[in-house]
Regions:
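Extracytoplasmic
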Residues: 31-62
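Conserved small/polar residues in nucleotide/adenosyl-binding loops
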Residues: 156-158
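Central cavity-lining transmembrane alpha-helices of secondary-active solute carriers
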Residues: 74-89
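Cytosolic juxtamembrane N-terminal segment immediately preceding the first transmembrane helix
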Residues: 1-39, 43
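Hydrophobic core of transmembrane alpha-helices in multi-pass small-molecule transporters
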Residues: 125-140
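C-terminal ends and interior cores of transmembrane alpha-helices
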Residues: 106-121
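Intracellular juxtamembrane helix-capping segments at the cytosolic ends
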Residues: 141-153
Length: 158
């Protein structure tokens, strides 16, 4: 028999109604908006970055075929479509704070990975495909987080 421990105070929102002044916390709402906006911007940058870099890889010294470049450029979009489903389902399970932290780390890893690997044309195809897949996290996170951002703010109180 397993028992579930209650979340610590402050870890979960017990009651959140942005239209009710008694339960609405303006500072938490604005802090959430700023953090979410930063992560959404990072997600969009990470998702867009490969589409700007991949067509220039052969000019940087790589020797990929057109087919390889096509699949590498398609991977972020394919991954985003798949990962959107994951990023819509996981926040209620893991908690938004943990998901935003995990997403930020993965997006920073992807973005830095592209920045490092294009400087020397020795990266194998599979490694750049992994980076392209990780960049798709940006698209999945962007489309998964964007709809929930408006839940924290009330137009009445702004």
């Amino acid at each position: 028999m397993t028992t579930k421990t209650a979340p610590a105070k402050g870890e979960w929102l017990e009651a959140w109604d942005p239209e009710n002044e008694q339960t609405w916390d303006k500072s938490l709402a604005w802090r959430t908006l700023w953090v979410t906006t930063f992560v959404l911007t990072l997600a969009f940058i990470a998702w867009f970055l490969p589409s700007a870099i991949i067509p220039k890889l052969n000019l940087l010294g790589y020797s990929f075929s057109k087919g390889q470049l096509y699949w590498m450029a398609a991977m972020p979009g394919l991954a985003a479509g798949l990962l959107r489903l994951v990023w819509m389902v996981l926040p209620p399970i893991m908690g938004t704070r943990k998901m935003v932290s995990l997403t930020s780390l993965l997006l920073i890893a992807s973005t830095l990975g592209w920045g490092v690997r294009v400087q020397s044309p020795t990266a194998p195809y599979w490694e750049l495909m992994v980076l392209a897949f990780l960049a798709g996290i940006g698209g999945g996170a962007f489309s998964g987080f964007m709809p929930s951002t408006s839940y924290f703010l009330s137009l009445i109180h702004i």
